């Protein structure tokens, strides 16, 4: 847990284009045989949230950027503190030390950071990023974020939410947030959602996470094909493999806008009845006729397993790149835009309103054996496509018997709308299937023959296919980790 918090904090410093202290966080923690604990650190809309006002302004959907109302109270720091309080061993100041040193002493700018910094042009209150024009490798310092980290290290969550950051958030919020919104931790521990699939127990966070789609999709694929899945790369079965999993994801996810909201029953969403109903729509020869309701994300996933076998699957996000493009002045912190998940339809179960949590794309996963021991921690960035990518990893590791390394490196597909936004797969009409350039030709031919609309990405286009990572623990305790080559990342083993 200490390693997960330390890595998450370091990424909050070095990858502001994907995550930060102004975002949200989920984690699955397996510390003893049995189901994992789930940490939900998704923030709630402020007390000033008023859907009628947005509708009166002529909005039919939530603002995406440039509007503080797109940002519920950030939950990330509450998540760090809650995870450390329950499972940490080292002092919090020591855990946050590496991130603080990166913020004060600087870190080399990555090519992706350099390429995305122009998106902040015109954003006020974040001069530590808007005033620099680094080249790849140039040193970047984050003095405002360093002060915020130092406050958390010394005084915990209250020093952040009730200190300089909190005061500045109330000011920039202009009535969207109140003192009471910041008084209590927004993080809570919850039981997971899960079911047995391919001989293992697959776990994800409950709603508001969309993680149930990974479990439901895997269960649908198993119900249709059992454990004997087609060969994902062979000419004879590759098209059937791709069709099976694409359809499992579509049949599981097409009604997500109506089903996923704060307070939704996660167990009911992966029930036997739901699995059977979805599986009944599958045909091996053609695309099912399912519809959503009509009309590039910024996230990181990390995982860690310690010497005692405690495993953490953690995901942290700004939602979209630099989030709402609203900075909390003087702090170096950019606010996320997770409020884009709310609905402005009157009476909708996910309607924007005070104290409500929006539906979340964040969907980490964890797998245990029937005896309750830890098998795999895994997850990915990728907006709406996260459960689809996790489904493909689960199918390869649990059903096809592949190593986590081969599964992570293997070609992928994702479902996507035509907008490229990454958060409207199920609300912008029938999604298309985007396939990586190195995928087997049989995938494309087999999917098109069955009625799917397919586009093939260019060789340089890997951004839309997630950055997945995982650690598998063999029965003898051997850890095998894989970091996605699509990202600038790594897997490491440390001894103390």
Regions found by a protein language model. Name each.
Residues 2-156, 160-162, 166-202, 206-209, ...:
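Noncatalytic scaffold domains of N-terminal-nucleophile
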Residues 10-11, 19, 23-31, 300-305, ...:
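Short beta-strand scaffold segments in enzyme catalytic cores
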Residues 148, 161-184, 262-284, 308, ...:
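Amphipathic alpha-helical
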Residues 189, 296-299, 360-362:
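Short, small/polar residue-rich loop motifs at catalytic or cofactor-binding pockets
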Residues 226-317, 331, 338, 458:
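Internal maturation/activation junctions in enzymes
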């Amino acid at each position: 847990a200490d390693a997960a918090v330390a890595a998450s904090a370091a990424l909050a410093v070095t990858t502001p284009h994907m995550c930060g202290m102004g975002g949200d966080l989920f984690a699955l923690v397996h510390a003893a045989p049995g189901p994992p604990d789930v940490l939900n650190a998704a923030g709630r809309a402020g007390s000033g949230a008023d859907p009628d006002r947005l509708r009166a302004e002529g909005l039919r959907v939530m603002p995406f950027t440039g509007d503080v109302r797109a940002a519920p109270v950030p939950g990330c720091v509450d998540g760090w503190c809650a995870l450390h309080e329950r499972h940490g061993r080292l002092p919090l100041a020591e855990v946050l030390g590496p991130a603080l040193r990166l913020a004060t002493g600087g870190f080399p700018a990555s090519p992706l950071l350099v390429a995305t910094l122009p998106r902040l042009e015109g954003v006020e209150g974040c001069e530590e990023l808007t005033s620099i024009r680094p080249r790849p490798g140039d040193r970047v310092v984050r003095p405002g974020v360093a002060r915020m980290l130092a406050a958390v290290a010394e005084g915990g969550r209250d020093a952040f939410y009730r200190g300089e950051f909190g005061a500045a958030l109330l000011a920039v919020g202009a009535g969207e947030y109140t003192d009471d919104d910041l008084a209590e931790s927004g993080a809570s521990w919850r039981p997971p959602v899960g079911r047995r699939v391919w001989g293992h127990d697959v776990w994800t966070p409950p709603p508001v996470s969309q993680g149930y789609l990974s479990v439901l999709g895997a269960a649908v694929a198993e119900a249709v094909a059992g454990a004997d899945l087609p060969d994902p790369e062979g000419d004879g079965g590759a098209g059937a493999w791709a069709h099976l999993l694409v359809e499992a994801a579509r049949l599981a996810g097409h009604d997500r806008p109506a089903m996923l909201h704060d307070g939704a029953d996660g167990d009911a969403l992966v029930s036997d009845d739901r699995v059977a109903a979805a599986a009944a729509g599958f045909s091996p020869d053609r695309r099912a006729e399912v519809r959503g309701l009509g009309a590039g994300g910024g996230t990181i996933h990390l995982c860690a397993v310690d010497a005692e076998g405690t495993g953490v699957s953690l995901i942290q996000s700004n939602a979209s790149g630099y989030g709402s493009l609203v900075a909390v002045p003087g702090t170096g912190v950019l606010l996320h835009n997770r409020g884009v998940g709310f609905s402005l339809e009157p009476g909708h179960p996910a309607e924007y309103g005070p104290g409500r949590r929006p539906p979340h794309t964040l969907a980490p996963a964890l797998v245990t054996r029937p005896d309750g021991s830890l098998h795999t921690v895994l997850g990915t960035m990728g907006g709406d496509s996260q459960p689809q990518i996790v489904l493909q990893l689960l199918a390869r590791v649990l059903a096809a018997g592949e190593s986590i390394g081969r599964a992570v490196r293997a070609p992928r597909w994702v479902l996507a709308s035509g907008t490229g936004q990454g958060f409207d797969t199920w609300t912008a009409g029938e999604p298309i299937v985007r396939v990586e350039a190195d995928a087997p030709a049989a995938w494309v031919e087999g999917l098109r023959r069955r009625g799917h609309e397919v586009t093939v990405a260019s060789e340089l286009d890997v951004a839309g296919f997630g950055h997945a990572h995982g650690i598998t623990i063999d029965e003898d305790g051997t850890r095998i980790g894989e970091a996605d080559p699509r990202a600038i990342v790594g897997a490491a083993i440390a001894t103390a």
